[in-house]
Amino acid sequence: MKNKNSEQNTHSTIGEQDIHYFHEGKHIYAYEFMGAHKACEEGIEGIRFTTWAPNAKSICVIGDFNYWQVEDKNYMEPITDAGLWSVFIPNAKNGDKYKFVVTNKDTNHYVYKSDPYAFFSELRPNTASIITTETQYTWSDDKWLEKRAKTNYYDNPMNVYELHLASWKTKNGKFLTYDELSETLPQYIKEMGYTHVEFMPLHEHPLDASWGYQPTGFYSVNSRHGDIIGLKRLVDKLHNNDIGVILDWVPGHFCKDQHGLIYFDGSPCYEYQEPTKAINKGWGTHNFDLGRNEVKCFLISNAMYWINEFHIDGLRVDAVSNILYLNYDREDGQWIPNIYGGHENLEGIAFLKELNGVLKHTCKGVITIAEESSSWPDISTPVEKGGLGFDFKWNMGWMNDTLRYISLDPVYRKYHHNLITFSMVYHYSEKFILSISHDEVVHGKKSLINKMWGDLWNKYAGLRLYMSYMIGHPGKKLIFMGSEFVQFVEWREYEQLQWQVVDQYESHKQTLHFFKKLNDFYHNETALWQCDYNHHGFRWIDADNSQQSILSFIRSSKDNKQKLIFICNFTPVTYYDYHLGVPDAGSYKEVFNSDNLEFGGSGQVMATEIFSSLQSSHGFEQRITIKIPPMATLVLKLIK
């Protein structure tokens, strides 16, 4: 089995070792010989096509090179009894469109299929695969990759900007190309202070409204924005601006459009044989058979493909619950228990462990993130310690609780105080990322600003309060595009964000400025990210002040030299002469205040130093007396 770290092979030899590892489910570079590859055989140049279809009677390759005619010379030959087929076509070349005509051995019914391993495809609604052999790119991100391999992300800042390429910005109503995005996106993300961008799926998908989560071409770069080289240039540019690239990846299920993976050889192939496991009624898709060796090769090789060929720094694995549970989104009687009588998908569990094990062993510094909403234990525990092996898990519980809390009238917040504090009860059980993702601003859930309580002033203040509370809470961060400049309408995948409001309204400009300052503050303060997953990094001052809806806590660096005190006031009331216990005697200074005038707040700031006094409060021997602005987060720092 080959083990390479960069560009694709340009020869077609399929060795016995490759075949063996493929059928054993252990090949992690299957894309090097599966699909369409440039070849020179007996001195003749052409393309070798290879696919897997165990229940096929015959497979013919049709395309531009043979006028889309079924011809004897273009039929594939079986090269194993387990379903590998291959053919060399001399006059096929880079840029030619093609499909497979697959005839089932039991029914003689034939279907026209796109190549599962195609590197590029036609723009929807067309569905042909495109021979793509000219993919070489000279990267300039060596320094980034060297740094990535040495980085421990647990004790470094991670502030992720989640992005849907098609609707971030457009040009005259049309999609921006990868090259056009390279001119603006890296600079914007860098200026705003985000450390990573997370792209929603970039593999080919037929329906725009699926946002990429119902893919057909797992190896095929989204053709709406250009070609492979363009995407590589975009990633390279991001890396050269010190921005990591995370990709949403969908290994659990696939689109059921007829040209795709569904019943690829006329029978269940990539999906489970058992319909109750294969058919995903909730999403209208089919679930991958994660216990089948060749399917595991397809998926793990796909992860390796994006990481090796496009220098992707992390995979956010979508819908992990659908992989873990046999009864996910199914009523009683709609699922079959495992061999032990449980609802756990044993094959899915084994697949996730194998995936994470492979990536840890072969891809230094690459992270995996689980989008998972259940209480499944040890998701971010290493495989060798009994876990699934992810590096991080989205904290869906924190997101649901806090968004519910922030939407309440402050009069009633004291009765629901646990919603804003409960997350710290379980925080150290996983390596959590606090995520406010695309899922929270669609389908009638309202935009982030419209989740806030009150009139316009209180909505803006509530947003600043909430985001600065989020920055102070342990865990890495993720925010969806548009929230940073206060898009009032829900996200719409069919049009660009409402960037015009930044120029039209001062409040939007001020909030964009607030996000930039908040991100810079986060990045510059070691205490906010160095001990996210260590009890030393967080301590409550007062978690129980439900009557006034005020939270106060301490964030600390590893060496304890940096301490930040957060005070979050979730009411529109200014509190004067508020006594707060502090851990150290000395002078404290306000270092961040979400109520600052420059952010659109009321300007209730403390410009002078605050000195502690030897009076006990909140379990500390020292206390300070401060003014707490309305609907705001105040951050203090010990300076001497």
Curated annotation (Swiss-Prot):
The active site is at 318 (nucleophile), 371 (proton donor). One of its GO terms (cellular component) is cytosol. It is an enzyme of class 2 (transferase). Pathway: Glycan biosynthesis; glycogen biosynthesis. Gene3D superfamilies: Glycosidases, Golgi alpha-mannosidase II, Immunoglobulins. Its EC number is 2.4.1.18. Pfam families: Alpha-amylase (PF00128), Alpha-amylase_C (PF02806), CBM_48 (PF02922). The keyword Glycosyltransferase applies. CDD domains: AmyAc_Glg_BE (cd11322), E_set_GBE_prok_N (cd02855). One of its GO terms (biological process) is glycogen biosynthetic process. Disulfide bonds: none annotated. GO terms for molecular function: 1,4-alpha-glucan branching enzyme activity; cation binding; hydrolase activity, hydrolyzing O-glycosyl compounds. Catalyzes the formation of the alpha-1,6-glucosidic linkages in glycogen by scission of a 1,4-alpha-linked oligosaccharide from growing alpha-1,4-glucan chains and the subsequent attachment of the oligosaccharide to the alpha-1,6 position. Belongs to the glycosyl hydrolase 13 family. GlgB subfamily. This is 1,4-alpha-glucan branching enzyme GlgB. It comes from Francisella tularensis subsp. tularensis (strain SCHU S4 / Schu 4). The gene is glgB.
